[in-house]
Amino acid sequence: GGFSLKDCFIKYAFPNGLYFRAGNFKESFGMAAMTSSGDLWFMEKANVVSAFAPEYHIGVQGTWEHDQFLGVAGVHFKKIEGNKEKDYSESNNKAGEDEGISVTARAVWQPVSADKVKGFHLGIAASYRTPKTTVGSLMPNTVRYSTRSLSYINKIKFLDTSPIASVSHDWLAGAELAGFYRGFRFQGEYIMNNTVRMEGLATEKFNGFYVQAAYLLFGGQQRYSKSRGAFSQPSFGRSWGDIELAARFDRIDLNGTEVMGGSSNGWTFGVNYYATRNLKFQLNYSYVDNDKYANAFGQAAVGYKSNGEIAYKPEEVDELLGKGGNAYGILGLRIQLNF
C-alpha cells in the first residue's frame, strides 16, 4: 500500500478575521478545488480542474475573512503522495534538484454572504509555479498535465501532454462565478495555464472551462461556505432527504504550440440522492468527445490510416475516413458514506 497525507497543519487565528496556518493542506486555487470531496456535485471534477488546479502541498498560508471579502495567499512546496511520487522526489533530491515552489493567491467577493437563502460569488485566483520533483526520476525542469476524462475507473489518460522539459515556470490564472437561490445553484470557472520554457522554446498555452447547475426537487436549500469560498452539502426538504438534478458542460484544450496533449468536450448529467447527512447516492452519465491528439501519449487508437489500418498517431489519421479522436459514454454509480 501507499501513503498520502491530506489536511495536517497548525493554525493561529487573530480576532479580526485573519489567520495563518502551516503544514499540509490544499492550495487555495479555484472554487471546485476548494469544494470538499464529500460535497462534489458529480462523481468527478471537470477535466480542466483535474488537470490544472493544484491541491495538497506543504506550505504556509494566510487567510483574511471580512464581511463580503475572502482573501487567501500562500507559499507552497512539495507534495506528499504515493510511493511513486515519493521515489521520484527522493531520486531528484539526491541529484541536487530543487523541490519547486508555488506562490498562490485567491480573492473572492461575496456581496450577500449574510443571506442564507440566496448568494453570489465572484472570484479570481493566480499561481506562480516552478517545476516539482514528482514528475519522474531524474527529470529536472519538467512538468506534465493529464486527466482521466471524467472517470477515475478508466486508468487511461487520453488527455496527456507527456513530460514537458526545459520549463522555467508556470503561470496559472482562474476566474470563478457562482450563485444560488433556495434550491437552485450554478457555478463556472475558467482556468488558463502558461508554461514558460527555457532554451528559446515557445511558451505553451493551455486552457479550459466548465459551467454547471443543479436544483433540489423537494424544497431543500443550497448552502455556501464563506470560509472556503465554495458550496457545501445542501439542507434537505424532506425527512427522508432530498433529490438533486445536476448538469455540466466542460472543455479542456491541452494543444499548445509544440505540445499537443489533446482537447475534449464533456457533458455530464447527474442525480444526487441525499439520504442523510452522512449518506449520498450519485448516478452520473457523461459523454466525452476527444480530438485526435488525445491519444494517451501514443497508447490509444485515434482513427484510421489511409490504408485502413488503425492509427495511434494523430498525423497518421486520414480524415477522409473520419475526423479522428474518441467519443464515448460513461455511466457511473457511487454510494458515499461520510464520517
Which sequence ranges carry the predicted segments?
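Outer-membrane beta-barrel pore domains
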Residues: G136-F339
